[in-house]
């Protein structure tokens, strides 16, 4: 019998596979399908994770950039105190302006921004109150609630540091004496104040603002790897203070 005849006979054979061969084929197919499904699930999980991180980073940095830009635009003139007495750990109230002029004397281009963290809604809102008159350094603005309000951040929470939650806004003023050369403390002359500027006079000493919050993606999931912690510090100064024995400095100097 030739080889061709043998092959034709095998092809015409209706006995099929044996039970053992069939079981081996089924098990092999299941293993291949399970491996493919595992790769698909892992790929989808990683894609969703990267998307969430991207969303959280983009939305968080957009909000942070806006706040920092407004703080950096707050020194209208030398020795001006932009942080207002209504500021708290969850609300930053400051006067700023945008102009081509080196110093802004009239209230024409000035505005008051009220940046508020709403813990229940998880949002950061920025209400802009336009100037209604006044002259430097006393400006008049619209009443709160009458300005333009914009949601600049969603799915925002307080940053956790161990068991503690950091305030959204922290306020700094110049220490009276700089740290000595052999000190183990930070060399900066700016020290965090333990009280918010509840009085008008206290607001005039605030020379730096710390901003910290955690941004989650649109899904609202705050699991590890999906949310992003953002933390920065903005100084209200034109230059660094001199290292004199007693530091006598303030905001926008």
Residue ranges, per PLM feature:
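A broad, structure-centric signal for solvent-exposed, well-ordered loop/edge residues
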Residues: 8, 63, 78, 101, ...
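Short, ordered beta-strand-loop transition motifs
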Residues: 83-89, 118-121, 200-205
């Amino acid at each position: 019998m030739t080889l061709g005849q043998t092959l034709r006979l095998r092809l015409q054979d209706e006995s099929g596979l044996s039970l053992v061969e069939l079981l081996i084929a089924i098990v092999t197919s299941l293993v291949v399908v399970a491996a493919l499904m595992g790769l698909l699930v892992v790929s989808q999980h990683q894609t969703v994770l990267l998307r969430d991180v991207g969303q959280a980073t983009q939305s968080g940095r957009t909000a942070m950039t806006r706040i920092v830009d407004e703080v950096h635009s707050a020194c209208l003139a030398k020795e001006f105190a932009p942080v207002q007495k209504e500021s708290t750990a969850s609300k930053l109230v400051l006067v700023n302006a945008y102009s081509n002029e080196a110093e802004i004397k009239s209230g024409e281009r000035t505005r008051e921004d009220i940046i508020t963290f709403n813990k229940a809604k998880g949002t950061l809102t920025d209400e802009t109150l336009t100037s209604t008159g006044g002259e430097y350094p006393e400006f008049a603005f619209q009443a709160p609630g009458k300005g333009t309000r914009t949601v600049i951040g969603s799915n925002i929470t307080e940053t956790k540091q161990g068991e503690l939650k950091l305030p959204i806004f922290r306020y700094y003023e110049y220490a009276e004496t700089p740290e000595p050369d052999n000190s183990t403390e930070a060399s900066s002359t700016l020290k965090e104040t333990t009280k918010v500027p509840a009085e008008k006079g206290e607001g005039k000493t605030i020379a730096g603002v710390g901003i910290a919050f955690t941004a989650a993606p649109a899904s609202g999931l705050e699991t590890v790897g999906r949310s992003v912690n953002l933390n920065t510090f903005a100084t209200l100064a034109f230059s660094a203070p001199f290292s004199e024995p007693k530091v006598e400095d303030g905001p926008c100097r």
